[in-house]
């Protein structure tokens, strides 16, 4: 997967929609559910967005400098992004998914050309500043607004959970720490399954869920949370009524059929 970000477009869109700043991590978190990202490029006059540079660097983006003085009619960032995307399309056949982070309708011809070359195109933009033409041309369009709302809900849930855990802390025995760690692992699995089921119908293979978790959290090891294998983690989720899991007789692995009654 390759990500091309028209930073100024989404930054302005966020500001006009009342968001403090554009958070690229919210976008990457969603994209990592879909596959591995091998190219990340962001285009802007970075002198105008100095405070955003650090976050983009930390997210491993290559920052392409497009001085504002060079803008003449057609946005130079748009042109450079299109050239780089098409170059990658024609030279790197293994990159099969292109993500355009922008709501600009000027990218519609690029989207069409990429799809002509059998590429999947995902758009990401702020709802109020995303062109209907661009949205309709993409195979999928993710609104930043939805990502932001999901992040807020998750933050509230985490704070509520932390408060409950703190209230319980004085009564905890030494074994409680291990139990708490298991809860963290189970929560991560449930979040991942929920995100995957948004894009897929039917069941999920346990191995797929672990692959996505490793993309999101490269340091993840189930043994840290007290599980001998990832399958043990899934079985525990099933026994707690969080997931409905069954063993696949052919592969010997586990299939997740959906959420349990206690999820």
Question: What is each PLM-predicted segment?
Answer:
Residues 1-90, 110-112, 120:
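Domain-level signal for Mg2+-assisted phosphodiester chemistry and nucleotide/NA-binding surfaces
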Residues 10-11, 70-72, 128-133, 149-151:
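Short gly/pro/ser/thr-enriched loop/turn and capping motifs at secondary-structure boundaries
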Residues 43-45, 96-103, 110, 114, ...:
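Acidic beta-strand-to-loop metal/phosphate-binding motif
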Residues 49-53, 126-134:
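Short, glycine/polar-rich helix-capping loops at beta-to-alpha or helix-loop-helix junctions
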Residues 59, 117, 136-138:
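Short, structured coil segments at secondary-structure junctions
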Residues 63, 98, 121, 141-142:
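Short, well-ordered beta-strand core segments
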Residues 124, 154-263:
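N-terminal regulatory modules in eukaryotic regulatory proteins
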Residues 135-136, 140-149, 158-163:
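Conserved phosphate-handling catalytic cores of large alpha/beta enzymes
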């Amino acid at each position: 997967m390759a990500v091309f970000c028209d930073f100024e477009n989404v930054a302005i869109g966020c500001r006009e929609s009342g968001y403090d700043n554009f958070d690229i991590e919210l976008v990457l978190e969603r994209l990592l559910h879909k596959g591995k990202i091998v190219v990340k490029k962001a285009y802007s006059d970075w002198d105008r967005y100095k405070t955003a540079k650090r976050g983009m660097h930390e997210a491993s983006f290559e920052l392409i400098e497009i001085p504002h003085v060079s803008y003449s009619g057609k946005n130079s960032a748009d042109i450079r992004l299109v050239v780089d995307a098409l170059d990658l399309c024609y030279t790197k056949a293994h990159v099969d998914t292109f993500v355009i982070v922008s709501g600009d309708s000027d990218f519609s011809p690029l989207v069409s050309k990429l799809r002509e070359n059998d590429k999947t195109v995902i758009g990401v933009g702020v709802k109020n500043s995303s062109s209907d033409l661009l949205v309709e041309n993409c195979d999928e369009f993710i609104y930043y607004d939805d990502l932001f709302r999901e992040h807020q809900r998750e933050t509230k849930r985490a704070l509520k959970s932390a408060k409950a855990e703190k209230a319980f802390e004085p009564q905890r025995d030494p074994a409680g720490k291990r139990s708490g760690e298991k809860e963290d692992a189970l929560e991560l699995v449930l979040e991942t399954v929920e995100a995957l089921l948004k894009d897929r119908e039917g069941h999920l293979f346990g191995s797929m869920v672990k692959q996505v978790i490793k993309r999101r959290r490269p340091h993840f090891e189930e043994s840290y949370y007290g599980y001998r294998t990832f399958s043990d983690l899934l079985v525990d989720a099933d026994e707690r009524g969080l997931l409905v899991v069954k063993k696949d007789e052919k592969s010997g692995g586990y299939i997740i059929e959906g959420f349990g009654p206690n999820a």
